[in-house]
Swiss-Prot record:
Residues 63-107, 266-288 have a biased composition (Acidic residues). This is Skeletal aspartic acid-rich protein 1. It is found in: Secreted. Residues 133-142, 244-265 have a biased composition (Basic and acidic residues). Its main location: secreted. Residues 33-145, 244-291 are annotated as: Disordered. Residues 1-24 form the signal peptide.
C-alpha cells in the first residue's frame, strides 16, 4: 500500500512537471518581467512590446461584463487590491488565457509593427544610401513606454492611451506611436476625413519629427537627389489578406456605416449648405472617407487618405496608402509628402467578434495534445507497474 501511495505521489509530481513544461514556453521563461504593456476595456485588449514597438490586438469573446465592476479606486494599478473584482491593467490576474490570445498562432489576433522608412525623390526613387535618410528595420529597436492613461480621449472620444517613442540616431529624428483604445462609440475627424469609431476600436497615431530630407546635393545624399517623400512601411498580421470594401457593401451586410452618407442634410448653419439638394447625388461639404479594409474574421481596418503635416492636412499621392504582399509578409505602405517639423499617420482597426463555436487556437490544441500524451504515458507506466 505504501508503494502504491509513493508511486501515486511520484505520478502526481510527474504529471505536474509535464503540465508545467507544456504550459511554460522557453520564450516566456526568458521574457523580461513587465517588459510589455497591455491595456484592456470590455472585451478588447491591446498589447505593446517596447522591443520593436509591436502592437497586438485581440477580442475576448468569452468576456463577462461583470468583470468591469471594479470597486477599487486605483487609476494606474500601482495600488492594486488582490480582492478587487477587476484590474484593467493586471493581465495575469484577470485574463488567464491572455498569453494564448497574444500568441502568433492565434489566427484572430491582429498585429502591427513598423518595418522600415525609405526616403524617395519626386519620382518615387531612392535618394541614395547616405546614413540618416532611411531606416532598414525596426526589429529589436528599443522603444520607451509612457504610463497608461485610462482617462484619456482622442478628439473628444473617451479612450485608454499608452505611447511609445524612439530616437533614430543616424538622422536624429523621433518616432512616436500614440495608441488609443476607444471606450465608447464616437465620431472623429482627421483633416478632411470624418469617420465613426466603436468601443473597442484601436487607433495608433504614428508621428515622425525632425526628419532631415536630402537637399539634392551629392554631399547630402549619394544620388544627389532631393527628398520629396517618406515611404513608411508597416508589416502586419491578420486572419485573411485585406480586401478593400465600400460603406455600401458593408451596409448590405447590416454593418453600421463608417462615414456619413452623402447628401444627408447638415444641422449646422454653414451658408454653403443652404442650397444643398439631398437628392442631387453630390455634396461638397461631405468629408472624405478613409479606405476601409476587411481583414477577415470580421475585423476591419481604416487607412486615412492623407496625413497631417503639422496642422495641415495633406493628401498622399494617388495609389497610397496601399496594402501589398512582400516576401510573404503583409505590409501597408504610406507615402508621406515632405514635411517641415512633423507628420502624423493615423490608421485604426476594429477587431472582429469570433463565433462562440469557433475552434480552439492551435497553441491550445498543442498543449492539450502534449498533456494527453503525457497522461497516456503515465497511465501506461502505472499499468505496467502492476
Amino acid at each position: 500500500m505504501a508503494f502504491v501511495s509513493c508511486f501515486h505521489l511520484r505520478l502526481l509530481f510527474l504529471c505536474l512537471a509535464l503540465f508545467m513544461a507544456a504550459e511554460c514556453r522557453p520564450d516566456e521563461l526568458n521574457k523580461k518581467v513587465d517588459s510589455d504593456e497591455t491595456i484592456s476595456d470590455d472585451d478588447v485588449s491591446a498589447r505593446v512590446q517596447p522591443n520593436g514597438g509591436k502592437i497586438m490586438i485581440v477580442r475576448d469573446n468569452d468576456y463577462d461584463a461583470s468583470d468591469d465592476n471594479d470597486n477599487d479606486n486605483d487609476d494606474d494599478d500601482n495600488n492594486d487590491n488582490d480582492n478587487d473584482n477587476d484590474d484593467d491593467n493586471d493581465v495575469d490576474r484577470d485574463n488567464d488565457n491572455d498569453d494564448d490570445d497574444f500568441d502568433d498562432s492565434n489566427d484572430d489576433m491582429l498585429s502591427f509593427e513598423l518595418d522600415s522608412i525609405e526616403e524617395k525623390d519626386s519620382d518615387g526613387n531612392d535618394v541614395g544610401s547616405t546614413e540618416g535618410h532611411s531606416v532598414e528595420s525596426f526589429e529589436d529597436r528599443p522603444f520607451s513606454l509612457s504610463s497608461v492613461d485610462r482617462n484619456s480621449n482622442a478628439l473628444g472620444v473617451a479612450a485608454i492611451n499608452v505611447n511609445l517613442s524612439t530616437k533614430l540616431e543616424d538622422s536624429n529624428a523621433d518616432v512616436d506611436i500614440m495608441l488609443y483604445l476607444f471606450r465608447e462609440d464616437g465620431t472623429i475627424s482627421f483633416g478632411n476625413e470624418t469617420f465613426d469609431v466603436q468601443a473597442g476600436t484601436v487607433k495608433f497615431n504614428i508621428k515622425i519629427s525632425n526628419w532631415d530630407f536630402c537637399d539634392g546635393s551629392a554631399q547630402d545624399c549619394s544620388e544627389a537627389k532631393a527628398g520629396e517623400y517618406l515611404d513608411v512601411n508597416i508589416k502586419f498580421k491578420s486572419k485573411d489578406t485585406p480586401i478593400e470594401v465600400t460603406d455600401e457593401e458593408r451596409k448590405s451586410q447590416n454593418k453600421p456605416a463608417v462615414c456619413k452618407d452623402k447628401d444627408t442634410p447638415d444641422t449646422d448653419s454653414d451658408p454653403d449648405d443652404s442650397s444643398d439638394n439631398a437628392n442631387d447625388g453630390d455634396d461638397d461639404d461631405d468629408d472624405d472617407c478613409p479606405h476601409i479594409y476587411n481583414m477577415g474574421g470580421d475585423s476591419e481596418m481604416l487607412l486615412n487618405r492623407g496625413v497631417m503635416n503639422g496642422d495641415t492636412y495633406t493628401a498622399m499621392p494617388f495609389g497610397f496608402p496601399k496594402v501589398e504582399i512582400e516576401d510573404g509578409e503583409k505590409k501597408i505602405k504610406f507615402r508621406v509628402p515632405k514635411f517641415d517639423d512633423n507628420v502624423n499617420i493615423d490608421p485604426s482597426v476594429t477587431p472582429g467578434r469570433v463565433p462562440k463555436n469557433a475552434s480552439p487556437s492551435p497553441a491550445l490544441c498543442l498543449k492539450i495534445h502534449i498533456l494527453f500524451i503525457a497522461l497516456l504515458q503515465a497511465v501506461t507506466l502505472f499499468i505496467n507497474s502492476w
